[in-house]
């Protein structure tokens, strides 16, 4: 698994790209599931108007962002979807990387069951941040958990591919930060065994 030192880099854009190709692994309720991280978004407080910690805003929900890098920041979006973020950087520097999509690896059958995704297109199983949490069984209970634990961690091994940058999704309110290319997508060649 990646060591805590990996997450302490203060350059959240670098880490959002660097996380691509690593596997996010969960061992929850006796079931192991994992997927290659193929889509991320960087959120850089305090200057990023799309970030929960813009202008050093602190709320009960975003307090994990002010922690030392290497923990999970999981919050509920629209009152129904849990979203998983990797807290990065130094203590009190509120940066996080949203994991937007994974390519299933281990336990795909478990992910299908958790998402009730039988007889549906597999390429849509984990192609959104709420879907990732549901498939990996990540809930608000896992908020602030260390990402160097057996329960939730990111693999050291990395798969390479072509990286594309685009603007982030769903942040029309973020003014001049709306169009910054802080969303990163990894294109893995289909010939590579995932």
UniProtKB/Swiss-Prot annotation:
It is an enzyme of class 3 (hydrolase). It comes from the Bacteria. The keyword Hydrolase applies. SUPFAM superfamilies: FMT C-terminal domain-like. Its EC number is 3.2.2.-. Signal peptide: none annotated. The keyword Hydrolase applies. Keywords: DNA damage, DNA repair, Hydrolase. One of its GO terms (molecular function) is DNA binding. It holds the Pfam family Pur_DNA_glyco. GO terms for biological process: base-excision repair. Belongs to the DNA glycosylase MPG family. HAMAP family: 3MGH. This is Putative 3-methyladenine DNA glycosylase. It comes from Chlamydia felis (strain Fe/C-56).
């Amino acid at each position: 698994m990646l060591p805590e030192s990996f997450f302490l880099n203060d350059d959240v854009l670098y880490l959002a790209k660097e996380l691509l190709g690593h596997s996010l692994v969960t061992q929850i309720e006796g079931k192991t599931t994992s997927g290659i991280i193929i889509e991320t978004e960087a959120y850089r407080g305090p200057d990023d108007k799309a970030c929960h910690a813009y202008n050093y805003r602190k709320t009960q929900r975003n307090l994990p962002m002010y922690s030392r890098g290497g923990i999970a920041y999981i919050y509920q979006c629209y009152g129904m979807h849990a979203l998983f973020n990797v807290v990065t950087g130094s203590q009190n520097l509120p940066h996080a990387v949203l994991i937007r999509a994974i390519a299933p690896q281990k336990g795909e059958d478990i992910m299908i069951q958790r998402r009730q995704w039988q007889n549906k297109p597999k390429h849509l199983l984990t192609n959104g941040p709420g879907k990732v949490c549901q498939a990996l069984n990540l809930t608000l209970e896992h908020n602030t958990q260390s990402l160097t634990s057996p329960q939730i961690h990111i693999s050291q091994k990395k798969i390479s591919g072509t990286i594309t940058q685009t603007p982030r999704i769903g942040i029309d309110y973020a003014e001049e930060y709306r169009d910054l290319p802080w969303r990163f997508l990894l294109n893995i060649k289909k010939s590579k065994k995932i």
